Every structure is written in C-alpha cells, then in structure tokens.
C-alpha cells in the first residue's frame, strides 16, 4: 500500500511540475513577405532553435508593410521587424517602441545604376533622373551622398517610382534608383541579363546603421521571453554561417512553392554576410550617430537619449 501511495505521490508531483515546461508563446510580424533577409528567423523555426529555447513562435507576414511597428506599439504582436532609421521617426511620433535586437547589422540600401548607362560615379548623376520609393529618409540619404562629392538633391530630378525600382531602371524611366537593396536589386537585374553598379551610402558620408531590427512595446517587453528569442536567433545564425546549403534547404522548406526561386537563391548568398551574428548586441555609438544624422536632415525634431529607443537585453 505504501508503495502505491508513493507511486501516486510521484505521479502527482510530476504532473504539478509539467506547466513549468510549457512553451512560451511569442509572436513576431515581419516587415514584408518572407525573404532571405529573414533567414535567421525562418531557420530558427525550421531547425528547432526556437523550440530548444522553450518558445512557440508565431511568424506573421503583414498585409501592409506600415503595420508591424504600429501593431507592436499597440501590443497586438510581441515583436516586429522594422528599420533602424524609421525607429527614430516612429518614437518621435509618440509610438512606445524600443529596439531589442538586430537582424541585419549593415546597411542594405544603395544607389543603383545600370552598367550600360556609363554612369560610373555619383558625379555622373548630375542632371539625371533618380527613382525612389519612400520619401524622407531616402531623400536625406541621397542628399548626403551627393554632398560628399559636391552635389545635392537639387542637381538631380527625383521621380517617385513606388516599389518598381528595377523595372524603372530596365525601362529607362529613370537613370538611377535610391532604396535598392544590394542583396536583391542587383540580383534581380542580373536575372534580366543586366549588370548593375551599386554605390553604398556608408561610403559617401552616411553613418553605418542596422538595416533590419526587432522592435517591441517599451512598456511591455518581456526580457526573459525576448532574451530566449534572441538566443535562438544567434544559434540559427551560427548554423547558417557554418551550413549555408543545409540552411537554405531549411529556409525553403518553410514555403517551398514561394521561396525556392532563382532570385531568392542568388539573394541568399549575398545576404548571409550581413546577418547580425550577435542579434542582442547594441552599438550605442552607431545608434547615437544615426540619431544625430536624422536630426541634422530634419527627419526628427531632436536626437533622443539612447535609452528612449534602444535596449540591450541580457
């Protein structure tokens, strides 16, 4: 009888401890549809790195790319993928957001021209048409780049091409585009049998920055859960760097019919070097320099203290 009682006591004790092993649920909304920029997130999901860190992650693709930070601010999702330059503007507008991690720790934005155009330097853009998608930051980016070689935005004709960056170049609608991601648009042009040339903002006076970051509501960010998410991302990134081919297979397995494309295959190789090896790491100096740049360009009223918009979670 004592043996039976001890057995049931053991079983009951085990059952009482089970809830502690329940996975933490966390939701993340991407900035756009799934692509190689999200490699670390998707591979962490497909290879079980989230699961190993006791997380059940819901990955959401937005219907509108403007939604993710707004939904994170409203606590409708736990995390959102956003852009470092936009974070300053969002916080200035009153959104209670804070950067908690990085996905892409290098600028991807660039000015792209076709090689056949014979535009061999930024100086050659004088009097030419430059296409853009998003006014504001891209205007400031281009103006700074042009200032570094003695020109300004007044020396070019800016044309809003919406999101048709590569098509506008290929059709001759514009001579150059700003806002082209160096890991995508150059490959998109190559698939059309055209060679592109890219000019990188960080080489023409623009402070280096993180292209893609993770943001959360500053008043409700759960350090433990977010920390586990960042640990899984770091593990996935290490796996990506060590096993790029296997990681590619894991990536496309998420949505085989949509992700296994020639463009994604090319972009994959060009994206891996830009992945944040230490997603939680915060470079305070770089973030403050970009804040000052945004203020100088009139994109935000003032450069806030770092603690107002970015944290490094242990």
Swiss-Prot record:
Keywords on record: Thiamine biosynthesis
Question: Pfam families annotated for this entry?
Answer: NMT1
Q: Which CDD domains match?
A: PBP2_ThiY
**BP terms from Gene Ontology:** thiamine biosynthetic process
- Family membership noted in the UniProt record: Belongs to the NMT1/THI5 family.
Q: What is this protein for, i.e. what is its function?
A: Probably involved in thiamine biosynthesis.
What's the name of the protein? Putative thiamine biosynthesis protein HI_0357
Source organism of the structure: Haemophilus influenzae (strain ATCC 51907 / DSM 11121 / KW20 / Rd)
Upper classification of the organism: Bacteria, Pseudomonadati, Pseudomonadota, Gammaproteobacteria, Pasteurellales
């Amino acid at each position: 009888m004592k043996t039976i009682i001890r057995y049931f006591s053991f079983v009951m004790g085990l059952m009482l401890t089970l809830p502690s092993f329940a996975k933490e649920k966390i939701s993340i909304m991407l900035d756009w549809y799934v692509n190689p920029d999200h490699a670390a997130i998707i591979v962490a999901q497909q290879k079980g790195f989230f699961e190993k860190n006791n997380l059940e992650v819901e990955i959401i693709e937005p219907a509108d790319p403007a939604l993710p930070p707004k939904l994170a601010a409203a606590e409708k999702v736990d995390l959102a993928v956003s852009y470092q330059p936009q974070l300053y503007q969002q916080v200035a507008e009153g959104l209670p957001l804070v950067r908690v991690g990085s996905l892409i720790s290098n600028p991807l934005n660039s000015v792209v021209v076709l090689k056949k155009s014979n535009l061999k330097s930024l100086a050659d853009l004088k009097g030419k048409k430059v296409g853009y998608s998003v006014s504001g930051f891209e205007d400031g980016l281009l103006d700074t780049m042009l200032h570094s070689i003695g020109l300004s935005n007044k020396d070019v004709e800016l044309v809003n091409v919406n999101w048709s960056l590569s098509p506008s170049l290929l059709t001759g609608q514009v001579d150059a585009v700003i806002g082209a991601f160096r890991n995508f648009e150059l490959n998109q042009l190559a698939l059309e049998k055209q060679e592109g040339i890219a000019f990188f903002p960080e080489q023409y006076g623009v402070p280096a920055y993180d292209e893609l970051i993770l943001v959360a509501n500053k008043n409700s960010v759960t350090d433990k859960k977010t920390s586990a998410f960042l640990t899984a991302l770091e593990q996935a990134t290490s796996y990506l760097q060590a096993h790029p081919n296997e990681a590619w297979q894991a990536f496309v397995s998420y949505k085989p019919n949509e992700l296994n494309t020639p463009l994604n295959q090319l972009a994959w190789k060009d994206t891996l070097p830009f992945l944040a090896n230490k997603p939680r790491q915060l470079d305070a100096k770089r973030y403050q320099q970009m804040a000052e740049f945004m203020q100088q360009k009139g994109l935000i009223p003032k450069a806030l203290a770092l603690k107002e918009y970015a944290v490094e979670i242990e």
